[in-house]
Curated annotation (Swiss-Prot):
It catalyses: L-methionyl-[protein] + [thioredoxin]-disulfide + H2O = L-methionyl-(S)-S-oxide-[protein] + [thioredoxin]-dithiol; [thioredoxin]-disulfide + L-methionine + H2O = L-methionine (S)-S-oxide + [thioredoxin]-dithiol. It comes from Brucella melitensis biotype 1 (strain ATCC 23456 / CCUG 17765 / NCTC 10094 / 16M). Transmembrane segments: none annotated. InterPro entries: Met_Sox_Rdtase_MsrA_dom, Met_Sox_Rdtase_MsrA_sf, MsrA_MetSO_reductase. This is Peptide methionine sulfoxide reductase MsrA. Disulfide bonds: none annotated.
Amino acid sequence: MSFFDSYRKKMQMPSKEEVLPGRVQPIPTAAAHFVSGHPLKGPWPDGMKQVLFGMGCFWGAERLFWQVPGVYVTAVGYAGGITPNPTYEETCTGLTGHAEVVLVVYDPKVVTLNELLALFWEEHDPTQGMRQGNDIGTTYRSVIYTFNAVDRAVAEKSRDAYSQALASRGLGPVTTQITDAPDFYYAEDYHQQYLAKNPDGYCGLRGTGVSCPIPLAH
């Protein structure tokens, strides 16, 4: 396979015939968040809400959100594909269909979904399709996965507002996928809160420089 064929393959979602089989057993992780000590997989306090964000390499994206007041816990993992309980190595092949994502569990009384969405839009480039900077492939696509219809509508409205802001600067179109949350598979323990364990580690986040105009209240 030539370089160009390999590149083109990485930019395409795999067919059902190509998808790796995965496994029944979940990938093991620590029980608690390395930074906050809160339960990584629950149970979480009553009233917490969830959202999944994919914005390139999940290391930097997770750190972005765990630092936000009102965010109870974060975790990195894989979602949006077909392979059950994939490994990192499998996901990197592009043959699972999954994107690298961050699970954000938050208290809506302290931080709104719109505030989280503003960070999402401003801190990566949502116009790059199946890549994010030098990270190339379907694994790094921009996604928002929501857990109810109301939150999905909020996310879609924010996308429309940010699309207009980008267009006014000659940028776009937005390629971010917004859907109902699919199955979320936790990534390996060494990926969880990676930049807290490795402060000098890689962080590929880079925004467009365009501010998000959405109102920060619900």
